[in-house]
C-alpha cells in the first residue's frame, strides 16, 4: 500500500532563504507534491528524508539558487487485489464514499456490493439482504474492501491507460448490460471526482463489507467451540497451504 521511492528534482531557493536552505528545500518539495500524484509511483503522502543536493546555479535575471535535490518520499499506491479497511464517509444512491483518513476519494459503485443489496431511501443507506435480514452499510462504519483498479484522473493527472479490448459479442445479455453500466459509472466518476488518484473497489467476496458483520460471526464461532468442551481435541490439525521531470527510483 505504501512505498518508499527516491526522486531527483530541481528546487529553487529565494535569496531571502539562503540562510535556511534545508527547511526551504523541505517546504518547496511539500508545496510541489502535496495532493499530487507522482506519475507511475503513486499519491504523495510525506517527505521521508533528503539524501543530498547538487551544485547551485543562478540564472540570468533570477537571483534565486537552483539546485538538484535527491530525496525520498512515501507514496500511496495499493496493488490490484489488495484488501484494505476504511470508514464510510457518505452514502447516496449513486455510490458509497470511503475514507482512509489521509485519502478520501474512494467511491464504491453499488453494483460492487454483496448480492443482493438495495438502497433504503428513508435511511439514505445501502443494505445487504442476508437470511431475510437487512445488514446496513452505516455512515461512519468500518468496512473492508478489495482494490479492483487504480487509475489516474485525466482531469488532474496523466490520462489513465486505455482499457484492453473487450469482446462484448461473447457476453450474454446480463453481462453486457452490467459491463455497459460499469463503463457509464466510470466515465461519470472521472468527471465528478477532483482527485488525482481514483480507486475502483468492490465488496462482493466473503469477508468483505462491514467489519462488524464478520467480527460478530467470529465471536459466535468461538462461543460454539467453547461449548463443545474440546470434544475434537484428538482430531488431526490440517496443514497450511502456504497475496525536466523528476527521476524516480523505487526502494527495495
From Swiss-Prot:
Entries under SUPFAM superfamilies matching the protein? N-terminal, heterodimerisation domain of RBP7 (RpoE), Nucleic acid-binding proteins
Q: What biological processes does GO assign it? A: transcription initiation at RNA polymerase III promoter
InterPro entries, alphabetically? NA-bd_OB-fold, RNA_pol_III_Rbc25, RNA_pol_Rpb7-like_N_sf, Rpb7-like, Rpb7-like_N
Q: Which Gene3D superfamilies match?
A: Nucleic acid-binding proteins, RNA polymerase Rpb7-like, N-terminal domain
Q: Where is the composition biased (Acidic residues)?
A: 220-252
Which GO CC annotations does the UniProt entry carry?
RNA polymerase III complex
Q: Which family does it belong to?
A: Belongs to the eukaryotic RPB7/RPC8 RNA polymerase subunit family.
Q: What does this protein do?
A: DNA-dependent RNA polymerase catalyzes the transcription of DNA into RNA using the four ribonucleoside triphosphates as substrates.
* Record protein name field: DNA-directed RNA polymerase III subunit rpc8
The protein's gene is named: polr3h-1
